[in-house]
């Protein structure tokens, strides 16, 4: 009876923590992702399957570290930085902006092709209004648009490189096909956004990262956004874990990026084992269930792509 009571208490606590965690990520007062319906909708397959690299990477909590890392990378490019500062609600509604980014990533990874297309249309409509001027690293003022393939490619590379690196460093789950498979498959995610020349291998991605390096710069505006990324207005209970994950994200960046950011050089060899344990602890606290994954898998069973939990058909 004692064990049963303890088990019941643990389950209740886990449900409470899981709800609070999902409220934080989705902005929904009930912790139900508003885009869950898009994941469930239709009897069609999506871009990815449960045994493919993008699905496995984005279902892993290491994406929390990767997301922070991607924001730091994007802040170093004057174009993407200006878009965030001028058109984003990151200051007035930080959780709303976070949930918007999570929505695109989640729908694109787990939803049907029809839902992915609808989500891309939503993002493209927003991008159509994001226009202005920014000052390059060389001091030249130029026009920009969020739909500009050059800036869109940088944002894509920053997310892709960050999710990949943080999965390699902080996750214990191997990626089927390795880095090349993740990059090649995830390139499909940005085709509906108008980017049809994304990197298709790790070598191509690293070459692109190096090509953008001369365009990166640090200004007072950069420092302002980095300070916000380091100290976002999150609930007090979430701040200790977030601060640790921020250090883990910073530690995963190349040394020259760390130098530009100017917040020191956290020791990766020290942070890595503790970050792996922290992510496992968070998973234990919120429980192994994922409403998003479960809905996607149910849809794939309806579509005849899966049977009894296993992939039985491959997409062309």
Predicted regions and their residues:
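Mature, function-bearing regions of proteins
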Residues: 1-154, 158-316
């Amino acid at each position: 009876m004692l064990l049963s009571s303890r088990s019941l208490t643990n389950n209740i606590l886990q449900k409470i923590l899981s709800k609070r965690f999902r409220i934080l990520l989705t902005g929904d007062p009930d912790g139900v992702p508003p885009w869950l319906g898009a994941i469930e909708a239709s009897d069609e397959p999506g871009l990815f399957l449960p045994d493919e690299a993008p699905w496995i990477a984005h279902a892993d909590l290491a994406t929390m570290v990767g997301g922070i890392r991607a924001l730091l990378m994007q802040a170093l490019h004057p174009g993407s930085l200006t878009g965030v500062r001028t058109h984003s609600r990151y200051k007035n509604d930080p959780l709303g902006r976070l949930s918007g980014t999570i929505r695109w990533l989640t729908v694109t990874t787990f939803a049907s092709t029809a839902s992915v297309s609808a989500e891309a249309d939503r993002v493209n409509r927003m991008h159509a209004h994001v226009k202005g001027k920014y000052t390059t690293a060389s001091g030249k003022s130029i026009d920009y648009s969020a739909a500009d393939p050059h800036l869109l490619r940088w944002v894509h590379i920053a997310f892709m490189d960050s999710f990949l690196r943080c999965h390699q460093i902080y996750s214990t789950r191997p990626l089927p096909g390795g880095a090349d498979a993740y990059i090649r498959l995830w390139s499909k995610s940005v085709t509906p956004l108008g980017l049809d020349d994304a990197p298709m291998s790790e070598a191509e991605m690293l070459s692109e990262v190096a090509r953008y390096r001369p365009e990166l710069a640090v200004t007072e505006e950069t420092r302002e956004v980095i300070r916000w990324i380091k100290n976002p207005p999150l609930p007090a209970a979430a701040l200790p874990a977030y601060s640790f994950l921020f250090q883990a994200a910073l530690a995963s960046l190349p040394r020259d990026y760390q130098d530009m950011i100017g917040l020191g050089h956290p020791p990766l060899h020290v942070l890595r084992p503790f970050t792996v344990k922290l992510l496992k602890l968070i998973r234990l606290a919120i429980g192994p269930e994922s409403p998003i994954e479960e809905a996607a898998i149910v849809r794939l069973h309806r579509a005849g792509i899966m049977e009894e939990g296993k992939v039985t058909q491959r997409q062309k």
